[in-house]
Amino acid sequence: MKKRIPTLLATMIATALYSQQGLAADLASQCMLGVPSYDRPLVQGDTNDLPVTINADHAKGDYPDDAVFTGSVDIMQGNSRLQADEVQLHQKEAPGQPEPVRTVDALGNVHYDDNQVILKGPKGWANLNTKDTNVWEGDYQMVGRQGRGKADLMKQRGENRYTILDNGSFTSCLPGSDTWSVVGSEIIHDREEQVAEIWNARFKVGPVPIFYSPYLQLPVGDKRRSGFLIPNAKYTTTNYFEFYLPYYWNIAPNMDATITPHYMHRRGNIMWENEFRYLSQAGAGLMELDYLPSDKVYEDEHPNDDSSRRWLFYWNHSGVMDQVWRFNVDYTKVSDPSYFNDFDNKYGSSTDGYATQKFSVGYAVQNFNATVSTKQFQVFSEQNTSSYSAEPQLDVNYYQNDVGPFDTRIYGQAVHFVNTRDDMPEATRVHLEPTINLPLSNNWGSINTEAKFLATHYQQTNLDWYNSRNTTKLDESVNRVMPQFKVDGKMVFERDMEMLAPGYTQTLEPRAQYLYVPYRDQSDIYNYDSSLLQSDYSGLFRDRTYGGLDRIASANQVTTGVTSRIYDDAAVERFNISVGQIYYFTESRTGDDNITWENDDKTGSLVWAGDTYWRISERWGLRGGIQYDTRLDNVATSNSSIEYRRDEDRLVQLNYHYASPEYIQATLPKYYSTAEQYKNGISQVGAVASRPIADRWSIVGAYYYDTNANKQADSMLGVQYSSCCYAIRVGYERKLNGWDNDKQHAVYDNAIGFNIELRGLSSNYGLGTQEMLRSNILPYQNTL
């Protein structure tokens, strides 16, 4: 299998590029061809007051009580129509009712239809006043949508809202196909609620019953309804056989939940996966609680742990109240560092190094905003679990623009850092940053002159253990004060490309920036939250080399760059390219000896960065970027991708990602950057392709190869068959799932998945390619 995936991908790429044959037809359109439509003029409003029209070969009656019609009888009122060989019409005066009760008995080849349903059988009855209708021993077919079946007795009730079946069946398969069906002693189809309720339900595949439930609900539309969703299963080398049976609970219009028992054979237990969504005045959010009571594999691998319970809690919330209050939560926590290696989860990955737990409350009015937050990290490393949390953090911004020709801003922050280890330094940091800008602009250019004053105070505690083991000592009280000055100028030139491409426009956008920040020795300040920022083209013009406030590098530098764009006659950007560099007049320093390049006195060093995008045609696109840093003496990072995308189901993408080991050491925490898997950096080439291979078959493949290790990094292959009443998806994935420090090699997981979806119950007729593309550990990202 591992050797065949690249070959299969190459075949898919070739057929996607050179096949000119379109899909035979849209699957939804094909399915609707087998569904009857209402072809008479639709009557709106109350039809009970409309006259009844009767056509027949023969008629006799006892006026006004009874009448008998025989021979091609056709009765119509509003949207309803009843046809039969013989019809008996009865009319009786009802006490207290202004209108007589009119009923119909129909015999022989009974056919009833309206704009909702068609009923056929040997015998029927109808109430012309209420539109209640009975048909015995017949079959039914929904109008304008999939859904049909048979029953001993079929009843229409509630102004055609309900179809009630006694000893009936239901399937969304088109006539001539009974691939699946549900039979029950009573079936009630509610068109308004878009649900079918079934008592003593037996689910059948063909003629074979495979599942029984005393009560079952099936959604027959796009409306939210409580009930079991379609189960699915897969096999992985991590957990062996896995089976999911999700239940959807429509709690209220503003909240719902999905409860999924997830059986894992190798773990010897059921994980309960509980997802809860809500919408309130304070915003919208999602919570997930997954719980595995015990895990026999974890017990064997971690015999010293007191508990083998495995769990995950995730909470995401975002909202605004009263237009001024803002509430945000981004919280993920798991029972142990191995959780995402052992279990697939959409809220985390085996490639993640940590989980974040952040709460924030903000207040914002014109010219002012303030946010109070707490932020913690759970590090997924058994070698180094040290991490800093901000408990709490206050951020304040005050803006006052148009103060004469100037714009002003004051930013302030106060934060207390706490470490998960008792022997690590902790600190309280207070920062104040007033800024004044002089913006000048016209229709072809702008220049912004900015001056800042950066004042930071640290009160550091718990320094004994660190100072006893390091030559550079930390001070308990540190004040750092520095000015910052920046001038940033941009121009935009534009020309028509009549000679080369009529209707197209090209721009040339040069940019130059001078930045000055004096040097301050920050070796007596511990690094609590700073890390090197990536220097892509836009990053060249940042005024900070590091994120956070603990490391503010000195700067005496000029950044220059140029961007060129090409727009078509519809003002759609077809091409852009950006190239820029930073020239350092003096070395950029912080005084931190742990930063490798600060040990070399390099003036005049350069950082180069370039980005490009080319929309070659409506179907072809190319993106790329590269950064070269003379301080690292190599290409720091680069990436490129080219994509052919005919539609969402037919695409091919080739991509390459690179990060040098020196760049990784400079940007990642030490306990990650020195890990064995990163010692040679990252160099991966990959391919992604998807394509319908027949009217109803689609295939998706992805393959990533590590050129440093000369081995596969990740691969995926998925195939889906889609019909009008069901879809079957089979997938295989081999993914990187961690690193074995004892054996010094990568750990892989092989997974085979199987999923069945009932079609015709909603408006989803997709070929499944996008779902399969997103399921990969390295999910597809659109280049166009």
Curated annotation (Swiss-Prot):
<keyword id="KW-0998">Cell outer membrane</keyword>
<dbReference type="InterPro" id="IPR007543">
    <property type="entry name" value="LptD_C"/>
</dbReference>
<dbReference type="GO" id="GO:0009279">
    <property type="term" value="C:cell outer membrane"/>
</dbReference>
<keyword id="KW-1015">Disulfide bond</keyword>
<dbReference type="Pfam" id="PF04453">
    <property type="entry name" value="LptD"/>
</dbReference>
<comment type="subunit">
    <text>Component of the lipopolysaccharide transport and assembly complex. Interacts with LptE and LptA.</text>
</comment>
<dbReference type="InterPro" id="IPR005653">
    <property type="entry name" value="OstA-like_N"/>
</dbReference>
<dbReference type="InterPro" id="IPR020889">
    <property type="entry name" value="LipoPS_assembly_LptD"/>
</dbReference>
<dbReference type="GO" id="GO:0043165">
    <property type="term" value="P:Gram-negative-bacterium-type cell outer membrane assembly"/>
</dbReference>
<comment type="similarity">
    <text>Belongs to the LptD family.</text>
</comment>
<comment type="function">
    <text>Together with LptE, is involved in the assembly of lipopolysaccharide (LPS) at the surface of the outer membrane.</text>
</comment>
<feature type="signal peptide">
    <location>
        <begin position="1"/>
        <end position="24"/>
    </location>
</feature>
<dbReference type="GO" id="GO:1990351">
    <property type="term" value="C:transporter complex"/>
</dbReference>
<protein>
    <recommendedName>
        <fullName>LPS-assembly protein LptD</fullName>
    </recommendedName>
</protein>
<feature type="disulfide bond">
    <location>
        <begin position="31"/>
        <end position="724"/>
    </location>
</feature>
<keyword id="KW-0732">Signal</keyword>
<keyword id="KW-0472">Membrane</keyword>
<dbReference type="InterPro" id="IPR050218">
    <property type="entry name" value="LptD"/>
</dbReference>
<feature type="disulfide bond">
    <location>
        <begin position="173"/>
        <end position="725"/>
    </location>
</feature>
<dbReference type="Pfam" id="PF03968">
    <property type="entry name" value="LptD_N"/>
</dbReference>
<dbReference type="GO" id="GO:0015920">
    <property type="term" value="P:lipopolysaccharide transport"/>
</dbReference>
